[in-house]
Amino acid sequence: MGLTPMMRQYLEVKESCKDCILFFRLGDFYEMFFEDAKVASKELELVLTGRDCGLEERAPMCGIPYHAANTYIGRLVSAGYKIAICEQLEDPSASKGIVKRGIIKIITPGTYTDSSFLEENKNNYIMSFYLDDNMCAMSFADISTGEFNSTHSNFKEAVVLDEISKFAPREIVLEENIKESFIHTIKERFPNISISKIKEENFDYNIDNNLKEQFNNFNENEYETIVKKSANGLLYYIFHTQKNILSNINKIDYYSIVDYLTIDVNSRRNLEITENLREKTKKGSLLWVLDKTNTAMGGRQLRRWIEQPLINKNPIENRLNAVEELLNNISLQEDLKEDLKSIYDIERIVGKVASKSVNAKELISLKCSIGKVPYIKKYLSNFKSDLFLNMEQCIDTLEDIHKLLDKALLDNPSLSVKEGNIIKEGFNEEVDSLREAKSNGKKWIASLEQKEKEETGIKSLKVSYNKVFGYFIEITKANLNLVPEGRYIRKQTLSNAERYITPELKEMEEKILGAEEKLIDIEYKLFTKIRDFIEENIDRMQKTARIISDIDCLCSLATVALENNYIKPNINAKNEILIEEGRHPVVEKVIPKGEFISNDSLIDTKENQLILITGPNMAGKSTYMRQVALITIMAQIGSFVPAKKANISICDKIFTRIGASDDLAAGKSTFMVEMWEVSNILKNATSKSLVLLDEVGRGTSTYDGLSIAWSVIEYICNNKNLRCKTLFATHYHELTKLEDNIEGVKNYSVSVSELENEIVFLRKIIRGGADQSYGIEVAKLAGLPSPVINRAKEILQHIEGDKEENSLNITPSKEYKSKDYIEASKDTLNTKNNLESEIKHDTLSETNAATIVEDESTKEHLSSNKKQINCRINDEKSIKKEVAVDSFQINFEYIKRDKIIEEIKNIDILNMTPMEGFNKLYDIINKTKDID
């Protein structure tokens, strides 16, 4: 038994796209067969059926309606699959034998441009990577906007990973013979990125001609061969998947990695530049604070500014001056912002023009958008700063395009371009004539209905239309005796009516439908001509769109500066960072207004090269260090900064080593990862770099950790080729002695006040080292039971006493008695005041900005609290036997036992942020106040 012709055709098509799920068009459905069907049915939750295919067993099959395909495609692409779309290439009714079919497009994570899949304020990049000896080249494209960027450098894995982190591509195209170890590294760091491989020859083939044909600014002598190969490989892949040359990709932008501030992968994560650490979402990041853009284009551009801060003084100052001018002209700024709100995503609309997928409604959106450009140009003429003057001179008002769209298209056209109702009256004589014929025909139909009602006496008679029978006269069965004989021709019988036609009705039907069909055809042809004209002018619209996005970014920075009382930083060439009353831009937004404690900073490459910060956990050391880095980044993107005064030197790189980061899946411990990160910093930092090191050495034994931290400080300060500006937080108080021995080391600490055996964090960074870590006091604040705290103090006294004798002699404690647990329970609830005053601010200060993600000490305190609560509840009965009821009433007598104790039992505190934990505790406390 042989394969059926259709199945033979399917397998031939499938052979050309083995790495894709094939959507095979059969009538009104896309069908999937064999393994593709099994995968799709699982991922899309479709029923898996079977189809006779000429083999002994039925072929597994599932399908989806073609008109709903985008929803299903988006789900598969989001899961990392590629989809090959196989369409019917001829009219089935006109074909003899099997319908001709072929792949019209391959959809991949990096090339899918459906609006439902794309994030409005984020690019959808696809990247290519080419390696040759010790050099590598990378190209990044967003086919929805037309951006195409390329760069190259000496090959270092860290450099490649940094660029991937910066652009966050959905897909990476590699040469098929590249080392698997490198691919493994990429997948390990970026598990959600799809990897695609192409042959070596696709990077080389017809390279100069391809690039000249695609890019109107390409000069083959300006680019290294390796860069051209990377770009050519990416263009090949785009053409291979889209089956078309995209006219919106018309310019290649080469950038040098060293032209922008380098922020490595770990630093982007630790500083929460564009997403928070915990949920990987925008909220709680620097981007979240700075993004007040009014257009999708501006939102994407601001993200790029933040991902790639500048390192050249002039462009930084140009942006700062423009922001300052906006702040000095609030009325003009508000007018600008109001018009920006009316501008749609010009870049992605013209991207749809290039791919021939734009509809008439989207062109109306384009018309409305470019209609605002003359007003924006007029506003720009009122500014004096260099950046705005240049924008005013360069912006194209696109009035010819606006005029055409306004004259040609209806204000509310059909969604489908193949259903007519697109072209405005007066634009084309033939369209107007056919519309009149169609309208007159329908008037004739209406008059016919009235005439037949009068002649037959059937008041319920109707003249109707459907696509199967055309126009017909419908008469209910109750009135069939009134139907005139000979003139009505029966067409269809229904359960409660009969349908008839007449010769004159069929004659008019042909005229009406002929006019309608012709009208739709002419309107579509006119629409394609309009679309082609716009496509010829894509470059003009893209340039205007970029200027609009820059204006939107500057307005956003001005808005944020005004709302948050930011100041204009001075950019210096002294290799010095001087900040007066600096504030963390994110943390100050998530705590009550006015409660953030500002701090000064002075870091240079001479006397204040390494700022050694000591003090207890939860006191704010990490927040302070991140604050300095974020203020520096803000200054280098051209933003005002949260401070009273800021004098910022341009940094070439920012490195951070903050927080614990086990990589257990890769078999790496906290300490191993920590040392790898420190090694990377010491190898790549320069004298112009800013380095943040937090608790170096804490992942190993005390003396090993102290020795490593000491040695790292010496290396940074004594290595003449390094001497980078450094903030170094530590709990090793022995390191404070280095100020007297190493030039450039300066001791600072977090101010702490002791009141009646309690500590209060003052959040101020002051000159001089801390004399103790207050570890036990922090543990007490975190809610550890009194017996544990008291025992810890005893052990500490023994250890400190035994240090001089070079021995450690501690007698094990007796087993805790029930009364100890009573005290522990009291302490747990009595931490209310401490938790209210400390957790709220301490965890915000010491954790990763607004994500409120607990650090190691906070996790321990939360874990301890959970154990105390469980212990208190489980031992309730035994406690009651040993103590008077009154002595235990403080914990539970004021609580409605069943509801509130159950609520406490079910608290999953380890999966709460500290702020959520505080709010839950506060809620429980309030409930107890309502109980008599």
Swiss-Prot record:
Which InterPro entries does the entry mention? DNA_mismatch_repair_MutS (IPR005748), DNA_mismatch_repair_MutS-lik_N (IPR007695), DNA_mismatch_repair_MutS/MSH (IPR017261), DNA_mismatch_repair_MutS_C (IPR000432), DNA_mismatch_repair_MutS_clamp (IPR007861), DNA_mismatch_repair_MutS_core (IPR007696), DNA_mismatch_repair_MutS_N (IPR016151), DNA_mismatch_repair_MutS_sf (IPR036187)
* GO CC annotations, alphabetized: cytosol
Protein's GO biological process: mismatch repair
The yes or no answer to whether the keyword RNA-binding is present is: no
**A Pfam family name for this chain?**
MutS_V
Q: Which NCBIfam families does UniProt cross-reference here?
A: mutS1, PRK05399.1
Tell me which PANTHER family the record gives: DNA MISMATCH REPAIR PROTEIN MSH1, MITOCHONDRIAL, DNA MISMATCH REPAIR PROTEIN MUTS FAMILY MEMBER
The text of the family note is: Belongs to the DNA mismatch repair MutS family.
Record's protein name: DNA mismatch repair protein MutS
Organism encoding this protein: Clostridium botulinum (strain Okra / Type B1)
Q: What is the lineage of its organism?
A: Bacteria, Bacillati, Bacillota, Clostridia, Eubacteriales
